[in-house]
């Protein structure tokens, strides 16, 4: 069985105003590395479309520091649908489609158009060609097969058995000699390494609820260790000051509340503040213009 993208060129999608976009990651490749990066992206594309898409991919690489293949992103919001609305030969194949669409939903993903779910760089996969191919593989996956995905690249379906994993994923396994920031950045640009965080590339992101219990335990134990709080006590009467209201750090205000403390959490991105407030992780929002500190 051969899984390929269509020879029909998709229409270039429009971008919804107000949706967060990832910053330019920086283009630092040599000419030879650039050629390899283009080949790595074009390997997913039928040869008939290479001449059209090569300049487009080059422009993405030059201006965004990555080749995302925006043209292959489905139009609109990728909200997770009821599982029975997905094509598939097994429940696991359908379930994984639900999970990755949930990771890329406008209401959930940090930078939906760049496939970043959370953590500033945590991607589901590297580009939209990989997304489409992964979806196609999941639609035909059976309980006698396992899909292997390497840094977003769908390696293929392998003969397996029902009790084995339906999907095996690895992300960004760098050889020790090249496990440094410079070579990592090069590998990302060239399309051979994907930083999936924990649950972005793993397809199972659940937001701050995944870390709130650990944050609660950390705060409470810090109080016991540093403030002499008894084992059966909590942090009432204490003020917790921190920063960050992202996908993980957004658990801080709720964790502090659970531990009995008051909390002040600073965040420079207004959109992230709005998201956490709407979701209930933050109880009150103010800005520096309205905030007043008494002397």
Question: Whereabouts are the PLM-identified features?
Answer:
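Long, compositionally biased, glycine/small-hydrophobic-enriched stretches that function as flexible linkers
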Residues: 1-208
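Short, hinge-like loop/turn segments at secondary-structure boundaries
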Residues: 281-285
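Short coil/turn linker and secondary-structure boundary residues
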Residues: 29, 268, 286-288
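General structural feature for long, well-ordered alpha-helical segments within catalytic domains
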Residues: 53, 126, 130-137, 165, ...
């Amino acid at each position: 069985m051969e899984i390929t993208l269509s020879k029909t060129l998709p229409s270039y999608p429009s971008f919804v105003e107000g949706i967060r976009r990832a910053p330019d990651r920086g283009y630092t490749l040599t000419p030879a590395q650039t050629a390899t990066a283009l080949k790595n992206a074009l390997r997913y594309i039928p040869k008939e479309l290479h001449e059209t898409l090569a300049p487009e991919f080059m422009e993405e690489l030059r201006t965004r520091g990555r080749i995302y293949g925006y043209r292959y992103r489905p139009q609109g919001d990728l909200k997770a649908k009821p599982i029975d609305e997905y094509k598939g030969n097994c429940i696991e194949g359908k379930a994984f489609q639900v999970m990755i669409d949930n990771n890329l939903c406008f209401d959930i993903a940090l930078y939906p158009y760049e496939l970043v779910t959370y953590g500033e760089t945590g991607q589901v996969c590297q580009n939209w060609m990989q997304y489409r191919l992964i979806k196609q593989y999941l639609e035909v996956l059976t309980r006698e097969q396992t899909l292997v995905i390497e840094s977003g690249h769908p390696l293929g379906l392998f003969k397996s058995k029902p009790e084995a994993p339906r999907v095996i994923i690895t992300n960004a396994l760098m050889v020790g000699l090249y496990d440094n920031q410079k070579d990592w950045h090069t590998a990302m640009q060239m399309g051979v390494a994907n930083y999936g965080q924990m649950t972005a590339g793993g397809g199972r992101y659940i937001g701050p609820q995944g870390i709130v219990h650990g944050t609660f335990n950390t705060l409470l134990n810090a109080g016991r260790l540093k403030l002499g709080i008894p084992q059966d006590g909590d942090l009432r009467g204490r003020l917790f000051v921190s920063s960050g209201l992202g996908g993980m750090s957004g658990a801080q205000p709720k964790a502090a509340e659970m531990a009995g403390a008051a909390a002040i959490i600073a965040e420079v991105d207004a959109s992230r503040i709005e998201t956490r407030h709407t979701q209930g992780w933050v109880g009150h929002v103010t800005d520096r213009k309205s905030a007043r500190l008494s002397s």
